[in-house]
């Protein structure tokens, strides 16, 4: 499927079609596919320099690291870290940094270093309408071919995205979605929704009920670098999520019914998505109160501005080491590859379809020998306390508490 996508894009560019859009489920190799397209087009000298844009610095770093693995003997530069290497063949940047660089980085004669013709191709990581609205000046300035990447399901991509990429009849250049990856090719694992002991009541509003302006507003929250602006929940949600009994039952649900580590003594690698930083800290504090035997090591906080967030995340990536649970708001939604994750807890209300898909994507990756020699990861489970699946009109397979085993 990656080869098919690479072939279609390269053929389009050769024909003079300047815009391509790839829809690929999280975990199926969007970055690797993009790197292959860049490699083919630059080695054939059909394209010169390339710009890779992402909306967060963590994703910029991850993309550059991935390209290094896939493309040999090509100069690369993370513009956020080293503007001195700006002559590189491939530049990686956030939208904000590039927008600033266009005006501020100059040649010796005072002219702009990044001229309109500097790049032959711009790769847009997670292409969606908020990006084009907020940073359209970049795409208006550079005269380059475009390659859009998105994990958003084809039938939920906004019309304006298709229009931006000149997709006739709303048909992307190539599509490879979660269902095909799971059911046909088995390159991702399925998930099951666990019936939880408590859920917040709501007004029955779904994503389909939102008008375009409301959807636009929610998706726009997802564009900022360094962390998404936290949605301020209604008072009723605040009262619910900061309730000791609610959080204690949520933790109990996870510890009793989550997929367990191969040792059978406790749950496997887990991400809890909290509503905001205060809520995340509240969950960690309640866990430590309920399980003092772990001495604060089992469940850790991974949020922006937390001094030990980086180390906690590094430790979380170690398959058999503490912590086994990380509590986050936005840091672990995208760009974090931990195949050992078997449990996701949605303790936050999500209004962005993009964010929802990326949160789910944290659990979809295959993992060999996770439960011992020859016993691979076959599934993961999701605990949803905020009716997010109902909001997005998703009806996945469910299980009652107690059905899940290692």
PLM regions and their residue ranges:
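Conserved RecA-like ASCE P-loop NTPase motor core of nucleic-acid helicases/translocases
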Residues: 21-23, 48-56, 268-276
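Conserved RecA-like helicase motor-core motifs
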Residues: 21, 49-51, 64, 71-83, ...
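Conserved C-terminal RecA-like helicase domain
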Residues: 89, 228-328
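SF2 helicase catalytic motif II
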Residues: 96, 110-148
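ATP-dependent helicase/translocase motor core
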Residues: 1-49, 58, 62-73, 87-90, ...
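Interdomain helical connector at the RecA1-RecA2 junction of SF1/SF2 helicase-like NTPases
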Residues: 159-267
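Conserved helix/coil segment N-terminal to the catalytic DExD/H
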Residues: 81-90, 96-117, 136
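Conserved RecA-like P-loop NTPase helicase motor core
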Residues: 96-99, 121, 299-403
């Amino acid at each position: 499927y990656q080869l098919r996508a690479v072939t279609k894009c390269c053929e389009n560019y050769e024909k003079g079609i300047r815009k391509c859009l790839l829809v690929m489920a999280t975990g199926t190799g969007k970055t690797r596919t993009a790197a292959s397209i860049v490699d083919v087009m630059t080695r054939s000298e059909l394209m010169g320099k390339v710009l890779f844009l992402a909306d967060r610095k963590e994703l910029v770093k991850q993309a550059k690291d991935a390209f290094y693995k896939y493309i040999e003997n090509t100069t690369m530069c993370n513009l956020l870290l080293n503007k001195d290497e700006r002559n590189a063949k491939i530049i990686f940047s956030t939208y904000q940094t590039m927008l600033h660089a266009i005006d501020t980085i100059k040649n010796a004669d005072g002219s702009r270093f990044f001229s309109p013709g500097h790049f032959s191709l711009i790769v847009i990581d997670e292409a969606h309408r908020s990006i084009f609205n907020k940073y359209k000046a970049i795409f208006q300035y550079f005269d380059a071919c475009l390659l859009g990447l998105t994990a958003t399901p084809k039938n939920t991509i906004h019309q304006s995205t298709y229009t931006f990429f000149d997709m006739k009849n709303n048909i992307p250049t190539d599509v490879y979605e979660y269902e095909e990856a799971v059911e046909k090719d088995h390159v991702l694992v399925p998930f099951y929704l666990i019936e939880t002991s408590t859920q917040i009541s709501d007004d029955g509003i779904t994503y389909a009920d939102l008008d375009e302006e409301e959807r636009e507003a929610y998706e726009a929250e997802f564009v900022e670098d360094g962390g998404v602006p936290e949605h301020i929940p209604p008072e009723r949600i605040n009262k619910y999520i900061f309730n000791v009994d609610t959080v204690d039952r949520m933790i109990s649900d996870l510890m009793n019914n989550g997929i367990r580590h191969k040792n059978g003594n406790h749950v496997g690698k887990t991400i809890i998505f909290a509503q905001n930083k205060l809520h995340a800290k509240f969950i960690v504090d309640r866990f430590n109160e309920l399980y003092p035997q772990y001495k604060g090591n089992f469940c850790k906080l991974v949020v922006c501005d937390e001094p030990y967030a980086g180390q906690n995340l590094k430790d979380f990536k170690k398959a058999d080491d503490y912590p086994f649970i990380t509590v986050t708001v936005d840091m672990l939604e995208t760009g974090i590859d931990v195949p050992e994750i078997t449990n996701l807890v949605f303790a936050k209300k999500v209004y962005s379809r993009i964010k929802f898909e990326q949160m789910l994507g944290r659990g979809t990756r295959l993992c060999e020998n996770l439960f011992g020699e020859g016993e691979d990861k076959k599934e993961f489970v999701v605990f949803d306390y905020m009716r997010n699946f109902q909001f997005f009109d998703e009806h996945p397979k469910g299980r009652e508490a107690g059905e899940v085993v290692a």
